[in-house]
Amino acid sequence: MARTAQKLITRIKRKVRVRKKIVGTAQRPRLNVFKSARHIYAQLIDDTAGITLASCSTLSTSAESLSYTGNIAAAVHVGKEIAGLAKEKNITAVVFDRNGFLYHGRIKALADAARESGLLF
């Protein structure tokens, strides 16, 4: 099996294993993170109602000032932006869902930026 295919299968197994254990509510939504080679996305999800409360990514208009969207600086920008959106909706605590990705690099940078901006997790 090709190395990239094996890495994807491993990530999906990790994702399913973790997703069984965490649930977001309206008071404490799930902060879901997804990264691709060029972009990073974050969502606040209420699993009990099945709705997305807030979302942002490097594709949003506030990220147009970034020269490159697939690096740690872009992840920090998205982390601060999602924390700001959460504050607007009076959300202070979240459950962090790294979506099967390792807690390293861009995922860690987004989480740290969200914590510095006031989100508790």
From Swiss-Prot:
KW rRNA-binding (keyword) present: yes
Cross-referenced Gene3D superfamilies: 3.30.420.100
SUPFAM superfamilies xrefs: Translational machinery components (SSF53137)
GO MF assignments: 5S rRNA binding; structural constituent of ribosome
Function in brief: This is one of the proteins that bind and probably mediate the attachment of the 5S RNA into the large ribosomal subunit, where it forms part of the central protuberance.
Pfam families, sorted: Ribosomal_L18p (PF00861)
Family statement: Belongs to the universal ribosomal protein uL18 family.
Record's keyword terms, sorted: Ribonucleoprotein, Ribosomal protein, RNA-binding, rRNA-binding
Family annotation (HAMAP family): Ribosomal_uL18_B
Protein's GO biological process: translation
A GO term from the CC aspect: cytosolic large ribosomal subunit
This protein's name: Large ribosomal subunit protein uL18
Assembly behavior: Part of the 50S ribosomal subunit; part of the 5S rRNA/L5/L18/L25 subcomplex. Contacts the 5S and 23S rRNAs.
